[in-house]
Amino acid sequence: MRLKSDLGLVLLAGAKGEFSGLSSLTLEWDERVALGVVLAAHGYPANPRKGDAIQGLPADGPDCVVFHAGTALNGEQLLSSGGRVLCVSALAASVESAQQVAYAAIAQIKLPGAQYRSDIGARAVA
C-alpha cells in the first residue's frame, strides 16, 4: 500500500536481470503510517476452523485495504480456509488514526469466532 510506484516494473527488471535498469527507477512511497491487523479463524493457532462464511467486507479504498490469506470461494460465497484469514491494512497520518481506520473496517466484517489483537500500534502511541 505504501509503494506508489509500479512494483511490476521493478520486479520485471529484476526478473530479466536488468539490475542496471533498477537504478534508473525512482520509487515513490506514501509517507503515511501503515498499520495491519490480522483476523484469525476460530481455534487459531492450534486448530483453526475452516468453512465459515465471511460477510461485510468493506470496499477497498485509498486508506484501507483488506488482504486475503486464508480465504476461498465456494461459488460466490467467501469462506475461511485457514488460520490467518484476512489482514486489514490502513494508512493514515498517525498511528492513532490508522488504528481507528483499521478497527472500524474490522467492525464491519462478519466472521464467526474471528479473533484479532486489539492492541496493534499501542506501543507506538504509549
Regions found by a protein language model. Name each.
Residues 46-49, 76-78, 97-100:
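Extended hydrophobic-aromatic, low-complexity segments
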Residues 36-38, 84-92:
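Short, well-ordered beta-strand elements within core beta-sheets of diverse protein domains
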Residues 1-60:
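Active-site "cap" helix and flanking loop/linker of ATP-utilizing ligase/carboxylase catalytic domains
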Residues 104-118:
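Short arginine-rich
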